[in-house]
């Protein structure tokens, strides 16, 4: 027996229920659109180079590593009854992609992966904070920065913590062994242990959980995946890792990630 608030789960995607449609319509009427405008302006603030719907591919891979064109539908229709209006607006904000200047000598590439990658221009070269998920997305981010800020050597890389979208693109930033030796790689205490725990010991469970968490199997449309809150999704390229040769915190990684 199904109660009136339940629907039978089938393979067929459904329209919004009357209750959901009414709730979303009421929410839409009460949105502070001035605040939405402020957030839109902040998302575009200090953009040096805008990259609309970036597409990043990998040689001999049928599907792209990264493709924000899938989210163009967010700008092609009004807010549907199936999606909470605030989520719809958040989905638009996270499509913003390109090179941004945070402040003097600090730059970010946004919208090339789930996380952002930060470049600090030091006296002798770049200090890179976090490296995205994939080698390919990190390579494109570095290329974009070098094209518009001048090419500089990578003097240091900082892994802020052990989640894969913050270190997986390291070989896109430091592609050869010579650079690896000449560049300092800072990681929190316990970093490698945390990476192994998450991606080896708990790999099967974490992979299954991530499919629910990120909505990987959902279509990108008004009845599927809209956004992940902090970004669109993780990239599907080459995940890489090198061991940090410097320690930047006395605290265990598990503490830093809480």
Which stretches of residues belong to each language-model region?
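N-terminal pre-domain segments of enzymes
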Residues: 2-91, 95-96
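Internal hydrophobic scaffold segments of catalytic domains
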Residues: 5, 12, 19-23, 167-210
